From Swiss-Prot:
Entry GO MF terms: serine-type peptidase activity
Active site: S124 (charge relay system), H158 (charge relay system)
GO biological process assignments: proteolysis
Enzyme Commission no: 3.4.21.-
Organism: Bacillus subtilis (strain 168)
Keywords: Hydrolase, Protease, Serine protease
Superkingdom to which the source organism belongs: Bacteria
Pfam families xref list: Peptidase_S51
Protein name: Uncharacterized peptidase YgaJ
């Protein structure tokens, strides 16, 4: 079973006192004390980000680790990744993440891990990366960016958290710079099983997610049912 959990925002890095999304991700592995690996690539392997990951996940019933491409934990990245139950990708610069992953061959390794049942998840840049394309500020202004294409469609994180995200996503789809896709508020996460949206969950009441597309020459937002984890 292939699983991807794409967060618009939230999780330990944005809600350190509310780990409900992080616990939800762990629960999908169906293993007691799942082995979870954090990929902080998009942040430039920020040590502060890595420390916050451990601070959060050491309070949960799991075995946390991380993969830095600046200081790889193993010369055999394939075996290291394939031994994990969950891969959790942090936020930051999506373009840099994609370039580094491709240079190291990590994009192919992660695809094989996903196909073999490793749960893959991420926030912001770590969510955009799984789709065909997404809205990113990697180069400054919000623009479109081609991504890995594990999932069909585009993705926009921080839909309610950053005021320019929603209008930028609408404009990019309207002008055919992006294909139709999904948008998620901070605190909302889309859970895909075998390439199909299974459900949407949230760490806070009121967090929403949408299917966004062109309909009769206008942008249409279709609200998705959201299961509140509180």
């Amino acid at each position: 079973m292939k699983q991807i959990i794409a967060m618009g925002g939230g999780g330990f890095s944005m809600e350190p006192d509310n780990l409900s999304l992080d616990q939800y991700i762990l629960n999908q592995s169906k293993r007691e004390q799942p082995r979870i690996c954090f990929l902080p690539t998009a942040s430039g392997d920020s040590q502060n980000y890595i420390q916050r990951f451990y601070h959060a996940f050491q309070t949960l019933d799991c075995v946390p680790s991380h993969l830095s491409l600046f200081k790889p934990p193993s010369s055999d990245l394939v075996s290291f990744v394939m031994e994990m139950d969950v891969i959790y990708v942090g936020g930051g610069n999506t373009r840099n993440l994609l370039v580094l992953w491709k240079e190291w061959g990590l994009d192919h390794i992660l695809r094989e891990a996903w196909k073999n049942g490793v749960v893959v998840a991420g926030i912001s840049a770590g969510a955009i990366c799984w789709f065909e394309e997404g809205v990113t500020d990697s180069a400054g202004p919000l623009t479109s960016l081609k991504s890995l294409g594990f999932l069909q469609g585009s993705f926009c994180p921080h839909y309610d958290g950053e005021k320019d995200r929603r209008p930028a996503y609408h404009q990019l789809i309207s002008n055919k710079f992006l294909c139709s896709g999904y948008a998620a508020d901070d605190g909302a996460a889309l859970h895909f099983i075998n390439d199909q949206l299974f459900q949407t969950v949230s760490s806070r009441s009121g967090a929403k997610a949408y299917r966004v597309m062109m309909a009769e020459h206008e942008i249409a937002e279709i609200p998705l049912p959201v299961k509140y984890l509180g």
